[in-house]
Amino acid sequence: MLFRSDTLGAMSVCDPQNSMHGIYGSYLSEHIFTKAPKLGFNSDCSVEIKILEENFEKNHEQIAGFIVEPIVQGAGGMRIYNPQFLQKARELCTKYDILLIADEIATGFGHTGLMFAVEHANIKPDIMTVGKGLTGGYMTMAAMITSREVSSVISNSEIGVLMHGPTFMGNPLACSVANASIDLLLESNWQSNVKNIENIFTQELQNAKDLKLVKDVRNIGAIGIIELVDDCYAQKVQDYCVKNGVWIRPFGKLIYSIVAYTIAENDLRKIVKTMIDAIKSIEK
């Protein structure tokens, strides 16, 4: 399956305030959204869980599936949150016979320290989407993985197949690259590498916490994030970083890096230091 995140259907289930909803307006179909869990892997998300429960109780007859980016919301603000939220979502989906759909496009294949982010909550989704890490970034490819129950419904339907066919679906070269990438990952010491990356991110990002232009720093696995107080500084930070040999792509007021598991320690420290130096240069 080809990774096509910017279709109308995909955009319609993204953040209604900070995504492309505003640009496309009434072209996108309406969906029910719930309050995002509080920032922090160990933060108390009881309020958001309560709201989630109320949403399910009120709207479950209208809900076919609950779509969530597990543990880390990507385009929704690079938000890291408590696995308890996912556990409650799984419980509610089971209770009301609703499909739990985990979007692991950005988090899958080790980015959060476990092979898949849902493992932090010890749950199994009914449908999981994967991409990016599927081929190690070398080829464009994504996939939808389903439970046996879901696949049986599709297989036993009148048509007998999932009627979805992007131009490059099942691309032989991309499939070969995906197989090779997964083999290399499983043969490597990736979990130890990602843990070391996480520790370095934790250490180095502390140097940004007290800067006046920084609202928050957070990290998990191979993902490190600096949230600025305003997005007006992002372009200057990017310009500084590129000029000093570090390529970054800010997202709104977020300066972040998702690094390769094979990155050298000195390169990782340089990335974080350069991002921090960029912010300091603006504060002068």
State what each model feature region is:
Residues M1-K284:
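Conserved N-terminal phosphate-binding loop of PLP-dependent enzymes in the Aspartate aminotransferase
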